[in-house]
Amino acid sequence: MNLHEYQAKQLFAEYGLPVSEGYACATPQEAAEAADKIGGNTWVVKCQVHAGGRGKAGGVKLAKSKDEIRAFAQNWLGKNLVTYQTDANGQPVTKILVESCTDIAKELYLGAVVDRGSRRVVFMASTEGGVEIEKVAHETPELIHKAALDPLVGPQPYQARELAFKLGLVGEQIKQFTKIFMGLGQMFLDCDFALLEINPLVITAQGNLHCLDGKINIDANALYRQPKLRQMHDPSQDDPREAHAAQWELNYVALDGNIGCMVNGAGLAMGTMDIVNLHGGSPANFLDVGGGATKERVTEAFKIILSDSKVQAVLVNIFGGIVRCDMIAEGIIGAVKEVGVKVPVVVRLEGNNAELGARKLADSGLNIIAATSLTDAAQQVVKAAEAK
């Protein structure tokens, strides 16, 4: 689950980290009033969406008057912001963050992520702030410095000092960086984060460290024990199909292709997408119905896949282990009848009751294409999609 920048900064402030005074506003009038609360004569106004690249898309502005703030809010609130990280529709802007302006002398990067390889929370720091860390990792990996947290003792001051020295910080800045590092480390563990970024972490004109931006992703599997963070969820930022799928315990991710995929098991789903690509097709989604798939969930899965107007054909790939292929076949038949499927459906069944499932599909009288293997299924669905 992602948080907005203003929500991330609220958490930073709770842990004693230096952030700009700011207010998240839902109306142009609120935005103008926020400037009065903050004071000064220059403010930064930012669209709040779950995507990067806001500045280049016009979603961040330096405002020198309340009229500029009001105009910015009127222009963006209720509209969608399209960035390089969103799809063509963009993300809806429901709040504008108005905050005080900071004079920047230098930009740094500080982030943390759960590293599955080392099974540790790993902090990353770099002197190359303000740019994508992926770009830095690709072009100049030697400029990224790391510190892995011991799961028994958590963040340690010596780790912060080592990173501070590598970033070229001096004097009071080292103390400030240590406080930020320790706070972020504790926050990461307390709040079950999966990813945390401050990009940029800036050195101000006065020589102090300041958290200018904030990006947080929370481990969705831990939300049951984070009631406060659950309340921060903004459903307006979710793909409606993904939200619908979550209600039925389906793992669905929308993609840009034209071949709908319904598979049981995440690994098999990824393999199915790969083989569709291998044979010249383009998956429209990732959809894992899980090991405990029911007839009702299969029906809902079909509805979700077909709600995407780009879908020209559907591939159902089921390996029956826990789940029975005949039950999946009943779900497919029921879904095709209920939804009124107008696109070709290719089905590959293997494993538990696969023969019985295949017979049920054959006896249904519906226009369902049976595949003999995964390769055959991929070839058939690509051919069917091209024919549409």
From Swiss-Prot:
GO cellular component: cytosol; succinate-CoA ligase complex
EC number, UniProt record: 6.2.1.5
Keywords: ATP-binding, Ligase, Magnesium, Metal-binding, Nucleotide-binding, Tricarboxylic acid cycle
GO biological process: succinyl-CoA metabolic process; tricarboxylic acid cycle
Record note on cofactor: Binds 1 Mg(2+) ion per subunit.
Pathway this chain belongs to: Carbohydrate metabolism; tricarboxylic acid cycle; succinate from succinyl-CoA (ligase route): step 1/1
MF term (GO), any: succinate-CoA ligase (GDP-forming) activity
Protein residues bound to substrate: 264, 321-323
Occurrences of domain ATP-grasp (ranges): 9-244
Residues annotated to bind Mg(2+): 199, 213
One Pfam short name: ATP-grasp_2
Statement: the UniProt record of this protein carries the keyword Amino-acid biosynthesis: no
Keyword Lyase in record: no
Binding site for ATP: 46, 53-55, 99, 102, 107
Cofactor requirement: Mg(2+)
Catalytic reaction equation(s): succinate + ATP + CoA = succinyl-CoA + ADP + phosphate; GTP + succinate + CoA = succinyl-CoA + GDP + phosphate
Function: Succinyl-CoA synthetase functions in the citric acid cycle (TCA), coupling the hydrolysis of succinyl-CoA to the synthesis of either ATP or GTP and thus represents the only step of substrate-level phosphorylation in the TCA. The beta subunit provides nucleotide specificity of the enzyme and binds the substrate succinate, while the binding sites for coenzyme A and phosphate are found in the alpha subunit.
Subunit structure: Heterotetramer of two alpha and two beta subunits.
NCBIfam families the UniProt entry points to: PRK00696.1, sucCoAbeta
Family of this protein: Belongs to the succinate/malate CoA ligase beta subunit family.
Name of the protein described by the UniProt record: Succinate--CoA ligase [ADP-forming] subunit beta
Organism (species): Aeromonas hydrophila subsp. hydrophila (strain ATCC 7966 / DSM 30187 / BCRC 13018 / CCUG 14551 / JCM 1027 / KCTC 2358 / NCIMB 9240 / NCTC 8049)
